[in-house]
Amino acid sequence: MRTTIKLFLPIIIALSITSTSTAQPSGSFISEEAQESCVKYGEEYGICPEMLMAMIEKESSGRPDVESGGCKGLMQISDRWHKDRMERLGVTDIYSVDGNIHVGADYLSELFEKYCDVGIVLMVYHGEKNAATKTELSDYADWILTRSAELERMNGK
């Protein structure tokens, strides 16, 4: 029995060190750089940083190089639709972690001013048809809100 414990103990220790070294303090698996930008722009725009993190997890799985349907980067920003916003904010590289989150947070802020309701804001951001008139949350909005709440709990909020 003691021999078995001696054999498995180093493996268990190695696994626990590996799993803790890759975990982010926020509970999110996105990069530390992205988390810092979420906090920075969350504070600047009055948006919950954990919601930004949840959106990044959902939109791009935390990968800054992702492109889908013309939308690019962590928050899946369309440089076609947000060209003026990018210029106004001084963002020249939509794949830049900080720049992408800056554009996404600025757009969300605009949507919050227009719609006020977080569910509608998320559905409009996601490009859902008739989002402003829906009476129920979409699966996308529900997932973001649920994950955001989980991240907030992990951060002691």
Where are the regions that the model predicts?
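Bacterial N-terminal signal peptides that target proteins for export
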Residues: 1-9
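Bacterial N-terminal signal peptides
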Residues: 8-16
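Catalytic glycan-binding domains that act on GlcNAc-containing polysaccharides
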Residues: 24-157
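N-terminal signal peptide c-region/cleavage motif recognized by signal peptidases
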Residues: 18-21
